[in-house]
UniProtKB/Swiss-Prot annotation:
Family annotation (SUPFAM superfamilies): GTPase activation domain, GAP
Superkingdom of origin: Eukaryota
Protein name according to UniProt: Rho GTPase-activating protein 39
GO biological process terms, semicolon-separated: postsynapse organization; signal transduction
Residue(s) at site: Arginine finger: 1
A single Gene Ontology CC term: glutamatergic synapse
PANTHER family attached to this UniProt entry: FI04035P, RHO GTPASE-ACTIVATING PROTEIN 39
One Pfam short name: RhoGAP
Gene: Arhgap39
Tissue: Preoptic area and testis.
Chain ranges of the Rho-GAP domain: 1-96
Gene3D superfamilies per the UniProt record, alphabetical: Rho GTPase activation protein
């Protein structure tokens, strides 16, 4: 979690965090990101009105959970969590999942 929050603005660092995950965790996350990448295609956004920012806002709390009980920390990290997920949707290469999804 802390690495995700620390690298929420850097596509290269965010992708490196994903590649450092255990294989099964990485595969599940890549599957989810691939699914979200399908949704952010312009034809789908035109119908759903769910662009990359909206999807990141909805999905970030399901992927990243702040361990702090301090509301200020939780509030500050929420923006970083959404940014991290948005970066992954925009930059993570999930082409190897092509036949799976």
């Amino acid at each position: 979690y802390e690495q995700c929050i620390a690298h929420y603005e850097s596509p290269e660092a965010a992708v490196a965090v994903v590649h450092a995950l255990p294989r099964i965790n990485r595969m599940v996350l890549c599957y989810l990101i691939r699914f979200l990448q399908v949704f952010v295609q312009p034809a789908n956004v035109a119908i759903t009105k769910m662009d990359v920012s909206n999807l990141a806002m909805v999905m970030a709390p399901n992927c990243l959970r702040c361990q702090s009980d301090d509301p200020r920390v939780i509030f500050e990290n929420t923006r970083k969590e959404m940014s991290f997920l948005r970066v992954l949707i925009q930059h993570l290469d999930t082409s190897f999942m092509e036949g799976v999804l």
